[in-house]
Amino acid sequence: MLTPPRTVVRRDGGLYALERALQRRGFRQVAGADEAGRGACAGPLVAAAAILPPGRRGEVDGLADSKLLTPASRERVYAEVIARASAYAVVVIPAAEVDLRGLHVCNLAAMRRALASLATPPEYVLTDGFGVDGLDVPGLAVWKGDRVAACVAAASVLAKVTRDRIMVELDLEFPGYGFAEHKGYITAEHSAALRERGPCPEHRFSYVNVATVSGRQGAPPRARRPLVAEADEAMERAGVVKGTVGVALGERPWAGASVGNDVAMEGGMG
């Protein structure tokens, strides 16, 4: 990220204070980026970016960190974010790609791709927790950004709802693991199912708990192993697949999609 200008915001200023302070400094298009699924041992990693319009048009009733909302509240807020956002993008990285590239590399690449896919180019970027390099606009990594910046909270909800819907679909495809309940995170139920059934193709074989029960020393099934590991820079050169709004509606992303050919949806009020 480029070095951001100095901006002072009151800690108790509310969810929209940081964006409004930046907008007063002349940054009208402030994008937030966040992810869902970093800590899960099954299912995809999902990153999202969102720009909310300035003023009252960008205020989303009930918007908060997705982890603080009930599933019903998340669905309602998700629909309102989609309706109000000036631009939004969601990128889905399959478990196989997380195993191949590594979690942190995929996480940064996914957020970078989501930001680059916004129909409205951002003038300033806020990210949750850590910075994303390779951006040509100033930005700021905000600790618990999904609780202090509205655009980051909006991205958090987009990523979380998209991923949860995918996990419900995976539960139908791979019954017995409880994906619809725990969404691929480590729980007592999930751990018991792993021990009893072994991992399925949607598990992340690079994770210790999955590798331990797989009996394959962490190697994924042959059907999931790519013949050639392409160079990381290919992830950045390849274009984003456009128009796959179905991902947000619960449809499965295309099998085997990589970071370089990721599944994305785009939209916004324009």
UniProtKB/Swiss-Prot annotation:
This is Ribonuclease HII. HAMAP family: RNase_HII_B. SUPFAM superfamilies: Ribonuclease H-like (SSF53098). Pfam families: RNase_HII (PF01351). Keywords: Cytoplasm, Endonuclease, Hydrolase, Manganese, Metal-binding, Nuclease. GO terms for cellular component: cytoplasm; ribonuclease H2 complex. Endonuclease that specifically degrades the RNA of RNA-DNA hybrids. It is an enzyme of class 3 (hydrolase). The gene is rnhB. Its EC number is 3.1.26.4. It catalyses: Endonucleolytic cleavage to 5'-phosphomonoester. A divalent metal cation binds at D34, E35, D128. Its cofactor is Mn(2+); Mg(2+). GO terms for biological process: DNA replication, removal of RNA primer; mismatch repair. Manganese or magnesium. Binds 1 divalent metal ion per monomer in the absence of substrate. May bind a second metal ion after substrate binding. Belongs to the RNase HII family. It is found in: Cytoplasm. Its main location: cytoplasm. GO terms for molecular function: manganese ion binding; RNA binding; RNA-DNA hybrid ribonuclease activity. Residues 28-222 form the RNase H type-2 domain. Signal peptide: none annotated.
